[in-house]
Amino acid sequence: WLSFGALIAIIFILPIFKNLPAQSLWASVSVNLFLLPILMYSFYEFPIYGVFLNLIVIPLLSVLMAAGLIGTMISLFWEHAGEAIFLCCRIIFRVYEHSCEAALRLPFARVVTGQPDIWKILFYYVFLFAAVLLLRKKEENKGEKRSGKKRGFLSVLLVGIGMTILLFTAQVKDKITITMLDVGQGDGLVIRGPEGKTYFMDGGSSDVKKVGEYRIEPYLLSQGIGSLDYVFVSHGDQDHISGIKELVQRQKTGVTIKRLVFPTQTVWDDALKELAEMAEKEGI
């Protein structure tokens, strides 16, 4: 979906910016405008600095694909020469990796939105396509300056309305929600308080691998929870802390934890001591 979406954006949206300088920037803007709902629906968040990262990714992509294709063909006849060309691909992948890691270290790098409803996505695309059609009409009537400015303003307004619908989530006040997560043989309790605070109690499993990364974290992000105010640990059994350990290890890329609450230190076992040390290293 991401590849098809990027292609549609370049074909359908980018031409309206053809007379503007810095075409790489506008290509990135076009792609991000179209992919925004897809990213939110699939990953429950979007990267603020994605527009600028694409200024690195898009120009190098053609080099990467060409080097990969040429390297594959040459390696059929001359393996060492093919490996030398593949080195270029590895360098580009390293550039991508380090650029993304650097962007993640910047403030507000990720905006956790949760998974939007389908109707919100449809409304967003209706407003986006309407804005693009208006701007295309503006290109066809270049002589009508006043009319063109009105269409430009209206197009920006339409995209803004679409984004507002897509991003807006009504918060239900004076209500407590409690969700029991299916983590196999284990526990995982998510609580949202009436004041908007989020709590998580005993997240772990003894029979599901990487339960934190693949079950607990995706659920939290899908609900728009990018940060947990309190995480409570009752004791150190695997089916109570294995997922919490993963969340602690993924503080830079996953759900952040503000406070980790342990039982009294007199009942700590080795597992709880290890978790406490791990949390301290991550600044929790």
Regions found by a protein language model. Name each.
Residues 2-16, 122-126, 130, 134:
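Alpha-helical hydrophobic membrane-insertion segments
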Residues 54, 65, 73-284:
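Non-globular, low-confidence helical/coil segments that flank catalytic cores
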Residues 4-108:
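Alpha-helical transmembrane segments of multi-pass integral membrane proteins
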